Every structure is written in structure tokens, then in C-alpha cells.
């Protein structure tokens, strides 16, 4: 969508709108995702070729010294098609906001939350899928879900003190033995065919991830009990919750929502950028996604919802479960004055309440309005932003997605906080692998930015 926005500005909103409409309605009747991609890719290749020919030398931004030392925050440096993060309204998946996705994407029979299959279809094609297309995708993933025996054996032999994310990354790496792309590349496949094999690998990997994740959960927390068999009549999330051992229909609905909203968050975050970077070396999707999961395992990326729960639990321990607004306000100030942050508040890009927080809050208001932990989260929502504004340091005093997700999981009995990032990883596959397909389809080259030393920067600045 960033490219579409640029197109609208640079060669006319009318033309760009026509391109969007063409993409969204091409081959809309087919239920085969690969067939639709085969139709869309040449059109997008031609569009980008024309765009680059006309505007390849156009300057899109400036780079400052602070950006280079500050984690490249705000630096426009890569093309990422599947989602765009707006500071004021949050994430848009191929142009659609989270409320729009909740309303427009197909749902399970009797369900109210969007199916992640529909979100993946949207990310890959730019089209809102039909129920038939989503059903096809559910069945396709069920058909591809079986794990090779060596991966099962490896998971069963991991020590119980090995972190779930380490197990996930290792298992994904070992699945590389199944890579269609790696085999075809070794045999000399033409680069115009790369995307077809990447597509097959991405579909296989997404299909197998719930089995890997459920196997890890059962081995660590359920005495190694069987995950059971995939049911081709059920959707991806329902099969996942069944394999985890959860039978509550509300928990399955929560998982559909969770897997949808955590799927993608633009291309600059650690996991998305890592998969993009590693994939640019023509590493297969298994290796690229395993690298992304190693980034997600870092405490500054994927562990935030655990930190929120730890902080909430400590808060309850110190001031009690039924705390007044005044005492809560004092506790928040004590947290800030001790040099710590309030976990779950603030975001590197967002400047308003994260819509992913809002939709989880709405889920809680509907299904668990009287839960003590949710009531505490709701109470914090009223108080924390005002305290942070008074302090004057936070650019964004509003809650993010992590302020809520752990509380919902706890309510339905998933109390194993070390496992939460695995759920995040299963979800994130939808976004980064959708983009990986397009990266190869569009022929994106090896990523190789120029680095500079401090001495080099000083000389550069002095010369200006």
C-alpha cells in the first residue's frame, strides 16, 4: 500500500485507484490462491517497472545522524507490500483497518471473529476472499499439515528446560529438509519461477506451524500427550486449539482474533525485517522464518505481553486485587520514578491507542467483563495515559497490543507465559511469508545497505 500511496501522489490518484481496483477484483472467482497470484504478478511487475522508470530517482526521505545511531527509526528504506502502519490509525492490511477486517473477512459458522485464512488471502492478493476461498485455504493447509518424522523425533527429545521459542526455531529450521525451493534452486530453476516454489514452501510452513507449536506445548506442559490428528473439516485456528488441548469455543474464537491481529505490522519490525533480509539471500522460507523467530524471541520484540503480566501480578501482590484509582496512580508513579516503564504502553510508531488493543478490549467486554485481571487492565486504561502525559516523556501514552493479550490467554487457562511468544510466531508467519512470496515474485535483490563508522560520519558532517 505504501507503493500505491506513492503512485497516487506521483502519477495521479485516479490511475492508482484503477490499479487497486484491478488488483482487488482480478480472478476473484477462483478458489486456488496460486492461480490468482499467477494472474496478479505480471500486472504488478509491469506496474512497478513503469513506476521505477518514471520515478526511480525521486527522493523519498532524508537520513540523519540520529537515525543511524537510533535504530534507523523513521528511515524509509524498504518496500513492504502487505501492511502499512499509520501513526494515527494503526495497522492497515492491504489498505483495510482492523475494524474493517473484522467486519468484512469471512468467519467460522456461528463465529464472530475473522478467520486468519481470510487475512492471509487478503495479504497475498489484496482481495477480500469469499467463504469458498477461505474454505479452500483451510482444507489446503489441513492437507499439508503433517510433520516429517525427524522433526517429531527432535521435538520429543528436546530437554524440558529449552525455551519454547528455541524449540520452535530449531524445528522450523529442521523443516528445511522439505523445501521445494531449495531443491529446485539446486537444480537450476529459472528466477522467474522462484515465487512458485516459495509459495509452496510458505503454504507448507504455515500449515505445519500449529502442529509444531502444539507439539512443543504438549511436551512442555501436558506430559507429552498426543496432539491428535488434523481435522480437514475444521479451520486452521480450530485445529490449533484442538491440538493444544483446549475445547472451549470462546478460546477458539479468541485464537482466531489473536492470530489475525498479530499477523503483520509493517516491514520494519525485527521479525518482518529479518525474514525479508534473510530471504533476500535466497534462503528458503524455512530458514528465513526461523531467523525471524530468533528475532521475535528477543525481549524487546516478542516478550512484551509476558512483561505486562509480570507487572500486573506484582501490582496485585503489592496493593491488592481491588485497588482504588488513587492507589493505582501512586503505584504507576512509583514505577516511573524508579526508572522503569509501564509495560504495554507506548509504541515506536503509533501515536494513538493501538487498534489491536481495542479489539481485544471489545472481546473482553463481551466475554469476560467481570474478570478481575481484565477489570484491572481496564482501570489502567483510564489512568496510565494521563500519568504518562503528566510525566511528559512519552511520545505515545496509549496502550499497545501487549497490554491486553496475556490477560485474555490467562483467563482461558493458558497460564504458561513462556509459551506466549510461540503463539505470536505462528501468527506472524501469515504476514511475513505473504510478503516473502511477493519479494521473490517482484525480484527484490539481495539487501545490502551501506554502513559507516563514527569517524566516517564525522568526516562526512565536517565536509558539509
From Swiss-Prot:
Name the source's superkingdom: Eukaryota
Transit peptide as recorded in UniProt? 1-27
Cite the active-site annotation.
301, 347, 402
**Native species of this protein?**
Sus scrofa (Pig)
Positions carrying N6,N6,N6-trimethyllysine: 395
Q: Which PROSITE patterns match?
A: CITRATE_SYNTHASE
Additional facts recorded: Citrate synthase is found in nearly all cells capable of oxidative metabolism.
A GO CC term attached to the entry? mitochondrial matrix
Give the metabolic or biological pathway.
Carbohydrate metabolism; tricarboxylic acid cycle; isocitrate from oxaloacetate: step 1/2
Q: Which residues carry this modification: N6-acetyllysine?
A: 76, 321, 327, 375, 382, 393, 459
Protein name (database record): Citrate synthase, mitochondrial
Q: Would the keyword Kinase be found if you checked this record's keyword annotation?
A: no
Tell me which EC number(s) this protein carries. Answer: 2.3.3.1
Just give the chief location class. Answer: mitochondrion
Q: Do you know which Gene3D superfamilies this protein is assigned to?
A: Citrate Synthase, domain 1, Cytochrome P450-Terp, domain 2
Q: In Gene Ontology terms, what is one molecular function of this protein?
A: citrate synthase activity
Q: Report the transmembrane regions from the record.
A: none
Describe what happens upon changing residue 402 to G/E.
Greatly reduces catalytic activity
